[in-house]
Amino acid sequence: MAEVPELASEMMAYYSSNEDDLFFEVDGPKQMKCSFQDLDLCPLDGGIQLQISHEHYNKGFRQAVSVVVAMEKLRKMLVPCPQTFQDNDLSTLIPFIFEEEPVFLDTCNNDACVHDAPVRSLHCTLRDAQLKSLVMSGPYELKALHLQGQDVEQQVVFSMSFVQGEESNDKVPVALGLKAKNLYLSCVLKDDKPTLQLESVDPKNYPKKKMEKRFVFNKIEINNKLECESAQFPNWYISTSQAENMPVFLGGTRGGQDITDFTMQFVSS
């Protein structure tokens, strides 16, 4: 079997005469001017540099060829070293790391958002300008009459909730529910006339910030007096009669025979 000859003058011809520049390229002998002391990966188009050690000149030609072949394969695999990483380089990497997907904002409609808003409420009693108190008369009716002594406990305690409505400097939208009862004052049209009634509601859904308009009253305070105007029927007010023990109703006149002025007394919860 033929033996591969030792590398001698053929290989030495590739070497530089400068001991500090002992390099050669796979593409052929060439004297290199760069120092191998600061070695980095080179660009693909810059060739491959090898350092030849003085202590290994006697290596066989077979080993030298193996090194050249191995380095030639590596040259096809190596990638150029990037420059110093900058902040703006991140923007070019992000599209490869993250997959962009559209984000759809699930906005709720105004009604749903308002329904979830907390409702501020207070407890109070109402008496008309003649100091008549409001009491229950039957399951769905209020009457106004004078109460004395222990009878005062019969007066209705309202849960006044501050709700959404056409608020202004002198008008505050409220809803008037009966404390500890599932009843609210509401204004509806009966026989073509605005009418005040007590309406039963589901306690799971009431009170809420956006009440139906029939439940809303514009609270108007003037000189420590209180008026409650229907939001459903403007210029119609919660009213009482001059007579004793008469139903509370919705009246269309102010300052006349019907009483529309009330005083409000707060009640602790």
UniProtKB/Swiss-Prot annotation:
A Pfam cross-reference name: IL1
InterPro entries recorded: IL-1_CS, IL-1_fam, IL-1_propep, IL1/FGF
GO cellular component: cytosol; extracellular space; lysosome
GO terms, molecular function: cytokine activity; integrin binding; interleukin-1 receptor binding
Gene Ontology BP terms: cellular response to lipopolysaccharide; cytokine-mediated signaling pathway; fever generation; immune response; positive regulation of cell division; positive regulation of immature T cell proliferation in thymus; positive regulation of T-helper 1 cell cytokine production; positive regulation of type II interferon production
UniProt-annotated location(s): Cytoplasm, Cytosol; Secreted; Lysosome; Secreted, Extracellular exosome
Listed PROSITE patterns: INTERLEUKIN_1
Prodomain residues: 1-116
UniProt xrefs under SMART domains: IL1 (SM00125)
Gene3D superfamilies xrefs: 2.80.10.50
Site (Important for interaction with integrin): 171, 179, 181, 190, 204
Subunit architecture: Monomer. In its precursor form, weakly interacts with full-length MEFV; the mature cytokine does not interact at all. Interacts with integrins ITGAV:ITGBV and ITGA5:ITGB1; integrin-binding is required for IL1B signaling. Interacts with cargo receptor TMED10; the interaction is direct and is required for the secretion of IL1B mature form. Interacts with HSP90AB1; the interaction facilitates cargo translocation into the ERGIC. Interacts with HSP90B1; the interaction facilitates cargo translocation into the ERGIC.
Described function: Potent pro-inflammatory cytokine. Initially discovered as the major endogenous pyrogen, induces prostaglandin synthesis, neutrophil influx and activation, T-cell activation and cytokine production, B-cell activation and antibody production, and fibroblast proliferation and collagen production. Promotes Th17 differentiation of T-cells. Synergizes with IL12/interleukin-12 to induce IFNG synthesis from T-helper 1 (Th1) cells. Plays a role in angiogenesis by inducing VEGF production synergistically with TNF and IL6.
Miscellaneous comment: IL1B production occurs in 2 steps, each being controlled by different stimuli. First, inflammatory signals, such as LPS, stimulate the synthesis and promote the accumulation of cytosolic stores of pro-IL1B (priming). Then additional signals are required for inflammasome assembly, leading to CASP1 activation, pro-IL1B processing and eventually secretion of the active cytokine. IL1B processing and secretion are temporarily associated.
Protein name in UniProt: Interleukin-1 beta
Classification lineage: Eukaryota, Metazoa, Chordata, Craniata, Vertebrata
